[in-house]
From Swiss-Prot:
GO biological process, one term: 'de novo' pyrimidine nucleobase biosynthetic process
Reaction catalyzed: (S)-dihydroorotate + a quinone = orotate + a quinol
PTM comment text: The uncleaved transit peptide is required for mitochondrial targeting and proper membrane integration.
Protein's recorded name: Dihydroorotate dehydrogenase (quinone), mitochondrial
Biological source species: Pongo abelii
GO molecular function: dihydroorotate dehydrogenase (quinone) activity
This protein's UniProt keywords: Flavoprotein, FMN, Membrane, Mitochondrion, Mitochondrion inner membrane, Oxidoreductase, Pyrimidine biosynthesis, Transit peptide, Transmembrane, Transmembrane helix
Record lineage: Eukaryota, Metazoa, Chordata, Craniata, Vertebrata
Gene field: DHODH
């Protein structure tokens, strides 16, 4: 019933485009015209669908491959080798879009250099009550309080196993897969939840992300404390190292932007001490920067998009310095242009991710970011994107 409702709303959107212009509009959709998506299609869909329904429809369309053709062809200039893998380009999709591993292949088709699914919890759970996601179009931002809604490890394992051989080939070709792990809301042993995630999905992932930074699960961010984090990550690494065979996925930790200087020093210390493979910097913020215009700006939840962009970039800069540039960083938060991506890379990120930008600009934003990034790299005298990693620290 829910899918039929979404399908009907999508059909209504097509009708609104107008009979005479339908053919031309269809052409613009299929070819991924950036201006058409940003100025017409996405605003129209936002007017018809609430944010969560639009999200579900986007995942469904992506899973079916109903996407515009990726127009930008990745050049060798954008290739990155990090975390034990080749990345065809440094722009990935952040966790939260494909929570349940339903649309991985469609996301690669969209032009992403890597895909991160999740968060996935051990047992299925509904998450927080609806409504739980809110657009702030005036601010190019979104607030969400999904609360780790998840189909659970068993269902996601089945989906990933069905495409395991395909993913192995994609990874070899420079398109790795990450899985973001979370804990169940009612769990009394968080470390065991993450360990179970490693055991079940570790053999199917190139990277595992320990998400201890979502603001929408009570007590989760407390796991970023030094003692708690050391205990948790020690168990995660033990489980990872105990996986059968030669497959050893990289382990990364995703941290919040709302950290004190001491918090960041403690995280860097634990990461270096234990030999964690990488950091994802940052998750959504619970802060509300001055100047937000959206009517729903006071809703509870994590804020993503343009407003926390600079906070994310500064956190990348700090974590790069605290780890002496020896721990690869994936930068996420407010990326919607090549300039945004390059700022994070120069601050210390080896790779970047986006998600909220899809809400406002649609699939063509992926090619736009890559095209602009390549142009800026050339303009600033870099031969390869890897030459720009941490460049601000060498000035």
């Amino acid at each position: 019933m829910a899918w039929r409702h979404l399908k009907k709303r999508a059909q209504d959107a097509v009708v609104i485009l107008g009979g005479g212009g339908l053919l031309f509009a269809s052409y613009l959709m299929a070819t991924g015209d950036e201006r058409f998506y940003a100025e017409h299609l996405m605003p129209t869909l936002q007017g018809l669908l609430d944010p969560e329904s639009a999200h579900r429809l986007a995942v469904r369309f992506t899973s079916l491959g109903l996407l515009p053709r990726a127009r930008f062809q990745d050049s060798d200039m954008l290739e990155v080798r990090v975390l034990g893998h080749k990345f065809r380009n440094p722009v990935g999709i952040a966790a939260g879009f494909d929570k349940h591993g339903e649309a991985v292949d469609g996301l690669y088709k969209m032009g992403f250099g890597f895909v991160e699914i999740g968060s996935v919890t051990p047992k299925p759970q509904e998450g927080n009550p609806r409504p739980r996601v809110f657009r702030l179009p005036e601010d190019q931002a979104v607030i969400n309080r999904y609360g780790f809604n998840s189909h659970g490890l068993s269902v996601v394992e089945h989906r990933l196993r069905a495409r395991q051989q395909k993913q192995a080939k994609l990874t070899e070709d420079g398109l790795p897969l990450g899985v973001n792990l979370g804990k169940n809301k009612t769990s009394v042993d968080a470390a065991e939840d993450y360990a179970e995630g490693v055991r079940v999905l570790g053999p199917l992932a190139d990277c595992l992300v320990v998400n201890v930074s979502s603001p929408n699960t009570a007590g989760l961010r407390n796991l970023q404390g030094k003692a708690e984090l050391r205990r948790l990550l020690t168990k995660v690494l033990q489980e990872r190292d105990g996986l059968r065979g030669v497959h050893r996925p990289a382990v990364l930790v995703k941290i919040a932007p709302d950290l004190t200087s001491q918090d960041k020093e403690d995280i860097a210390s634990v990461v270096k001490e234990l030999g964690i493979d990488g950091l994802i910097v940052t998750n959504t913020t619970v802060s509300r920067p001055a100047g937000l215009q959206g009517a729903l700006r006071s809703e509870t939840g994590g804020l993503s998009g343009k407003p926390p962009r600079d906070l994310s970039t500064e956190t990348i800069r700090e974590m790069y310095a605290l780890t002496q540039g020896r721990v690869p960083i994936i930068g996420v938060g407010g990326v919607s242009s090549g300039q945004d991506a390059l700022e994070k890379i120069r601050a210390g990120a080896s790779l970047v991710q986006l998600y909220t930008a899809l809400t406002f600009w649609g699939p063509p934003v992926v090619g736009k970011v890559k095209r602009e990034l390549e142009a800026l790299l050339k303009e600033q005298g870099f031969c390869r994107v890897t030459d720009a990693i941490g460049a601000d620290h060498r000035r």
